[in-house]
Amino acid sequence: MTTRYRVEYALKTHRRDQFIEWIKALLAVPFVLYSQPHGVLEDPDRSVDTLSQTREEAHRRYSEIFRDIEAMIDDHIAHQNDAENPFPSKLKLLVPSIGPFFTRLPLEAAFKFQDNKRYISSRRFVSPSFNDIRLILNSAQIMAVTTYGTLQLATFDGDVTLYDDGQSLEPTSPVIPRLLDLLRKNVKIGIVTAAGYTTADRYYSRLHGLLDAMANSADLTPSQKQSLVVMGGEANYLFEFDSSSPHLLAPVPRQHWLTPEMAAWNEQDIAQLLDVAEAALRDCIKTLNLPATLMRKDRAVGIIPVSPEIRIPRESLEETVLLVQKILELSTVGRSRRVPFCAFNGGRDVFVDIGDKSWGVTVCQRWFSQKEGPHGVIKGENTLHVGDQFLSAGANDFRARSVGTTAWIASPVETVELLDELAELMGKKMS
């Protein structure tokens, strides 16, 4: 029983998104009922009409399901906005892990958009997949932030979102002109990355393509150029664009941007939490015989491969994340919850950071709100965070869901497609 529990929970549940899995299960029913895999054996002339009818019926049933989920989300939003209602929404009962929604989600329209691109209703052997639903949710979210309100802030993860894992944002990257287009539309940009560098030169080496393009742009106003910040170490180091700086980024003193809640974090608690994490990581290196070395920073501690050529197995990284996270949660300083932390799998390494991306995105919201004055407050419904790690454990974009809308991508190519979709929707709204 213990072994089965460990397999089912520790190795599988943390790699799933309950909301997406629930939608996937709902869509499996019409797929089973209306797909026609035997059509490949029928007479071609007959099968064309049959498949067309089947596709239309599957599309209709899928659309109905997304319309019903859309209504459930509306009901969930009504419940979360009613502080006096003690009862959970129907969606909360069906998907207990569901969190807050900052906007409505036009899921039916988003499904029809993605169905035209991915031909989901035409498939006979492959049911609507996790990735299909993830992209439908992305489309619904960017439809919402451009239709029901105004996008004021877009924040991005670094690795796997803006550039490939371990690489840099090169001048030839197709992401760059799309980010510049957002700046021209007066959308603020925050790059919220786990990379915990304390100096501007290290961030310049990762982001030089974008920073140089901004510095050399003739059609960006000084105000628009000031609309980019880099938040490093999840929520620990803030840099703003500065064309006069040698590395085009200027560090912002911590006392200028810390939120009142972050300013209350005790340095002794931070040191104690990192000490516990360090001991747990050392134990993992020994127990799992990891080819890794420990790295301690002022606001983070982690393990990295002993040489760049070595890749630690994914399962070992996940085991390390889950073990360290559990040890921290059960520790005295962890139980006190005085200092938030994030244990995450970086793909090649594992780190524990003080704070998490919900704090990083919050700092970006407040930083730009302060610059805009009392009428420029950036709320969750006006914020879009784009990242690749949204699973419930070992994923550092997950907690950004608590402070703004999100889009879950799987590669820089998907980021480009998302930004193109966003630009088209923003263009329609302005026209």
Curated annotation (Swiss-Prot):
Reactions catalysed according to its record: IMP + H2O = inosine + phosphate
What GO biological process terms are annotated to this protein in UniProt?
inosine salvage; nicotinamide riboside biosynthetic process; nicotinic acid riboside biosynthetic process; nucleotide metabolic process
Q: What is its EC number?
A: 3.1.3.99
Name the residues that bind IMP: D157, D159, D165, T193, D349, K357
Q: In Gene Ontology terms, what is one molecular function of this protein?
A: IMP 5'-nucleotidase activity
Instruction: Tell me which residues this entry annotates as catalytic.
Output: D157 (nucleophile), D159 (proton donor)
Which sites bind Mg(2+)? Answer: D157, D159, D388
Q: How is its activity regulated?
A: Allosterically activated by ATP. ATP binding is a prerequisite to magnesium and substrate binding. ATP binds to 2 of the subunits in the homotetramer inducing a closure of these 2 subunits and the release of the C-terminal loop, thereby activating the enzyme.
Query: Which keywords, in A-to-Z order, does the entry hold?
Result: ATP-binding, Hydrolase, Magnesium, Metal-binding, Nucleotide metabolism, Nucleotide-binding
Q: What class of enzyme is it?
A: hydrolase
Which residues are ATP-binding?
Answer: K117
Cofactor names from the entry are: Mg(2+)
Q: What does this protein do?
A: IMP-specific 5'-nucleotidase involved in IMP (inositol monophosphate) degradation.
Q: How does it assemble?
A: Homotetramer.
- Family, per the entry? Belongs to the ISN1 family.
Q: What is this protein called?
A: IMP-specific 5'-nucleotidase 1
Its source organism is Neurospora crassa (strain ATCC 24698 / 74-OR23-1A / CBS 708.71 / DSM 1257 / FGSC 987)
The gene behind this protein is isn-1
